[in-house]
């Protein structure tokens, strides 16, 4: 399977970065063809300065990301949840990459996702307990329905570790979650 891993934390030394790398490494060992976009290290302006009415001066990175998305069968997003949403750099990636004509189009008043047939997984961390998002929805349901679902991508798996930087957050707590991520990558 062709897998694209998108690491969405702006911090190259973050736990989300570690999780994305663990998934990518394990998926390669399992025989998958893996590419990774590491937004913490990319030279990429995440600000959509003119909406979609005008192209920005440098479209090289978004065009490369679109090529990677078109290539992939499965996308894996790894990111922390901050203020009930993804980090700004990941939001900017979505804004500049999942553009009209590439990811979706409108036919009259109806939208059509153009990335149908692709699947995705979310690997997320949060300071809040995980059950809060299962109970109230929030960012996970938004990603499933209003981001991925809107462009035709089917969310097949969500791995979430809550209570990061809380009393239960120990090295063994995090290591157990890394192993869960590795097991998912193995299939």
Q: Locations of the language-model features?
A:
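Glycine-rich phosphate/pyrophosphate-binding loop and the adjoining helix
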Residues: 134-187
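N-terminal beta-loop-helix "entrance" segment that forms/cooperates
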Residues: 39-57, 170
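N-terminal beta1-alpha1 ligand-phosphate binding loop
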Residues: 1-32, 37
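Glycine-rich, highly charged phosphate/nucleotide-binding loops
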Residues: 53-71, 174-181
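Short, glycine/serine-rich, charged loops/turns that create anion-binding
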Residues: 10-11, 41, 127-128
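Helix-loop-strand module that forms the ligand-binding subsite of alpha/beta enzymes
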Residues: 61-144
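A short beta-strand-loop structural module common to alpha/beta enzyme folds
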Residues: 32-43, 159-162
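Short, glycine/charged-enriched secondary-structure capping and boundary segments
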Residues: 18-21, 49-52, 90-93, 135-138, ...
């Amino acid at each position: 399977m062709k897998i694209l891993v998108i690491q969405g934390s702006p911090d190259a030394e973050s736990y989300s970065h570690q999780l994305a790398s663990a998934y990518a490494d394990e998926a390669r060992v399992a025989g998958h063809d893996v590419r990774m976009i590491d937004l913490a290290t990319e030279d990429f302006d995440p600000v959509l300065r003119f909406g979609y009415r005008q192209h920005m001066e440098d479209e090289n990175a978004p065009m490369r990301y679109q090529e990677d998305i078109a290539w992939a069968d499965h996308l894996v997003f790894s990111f922390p949840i901050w203020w009930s949403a993804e980090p700004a750099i990941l939001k900017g990636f979505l804004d500049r990459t999942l553009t009209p004509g590439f990811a979706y189009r409108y036919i009259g008043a109806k939208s059509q996702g153009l990335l149908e047939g692709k699947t995705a997984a979310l690997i997320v961390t949060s300071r809040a307990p995980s059950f809060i998002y299962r109970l109230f929805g929030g960012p996970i349901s938004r990603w499933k329905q209003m981001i991925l679902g809107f462009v035709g991508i089917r969310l097949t798996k969500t791995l979430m570790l809550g209570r990061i930087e809380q009393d239960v957050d120990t090295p063994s707590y995090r290591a157990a979650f890394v192993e869960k991520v590795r097991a998912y990558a193995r299939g």
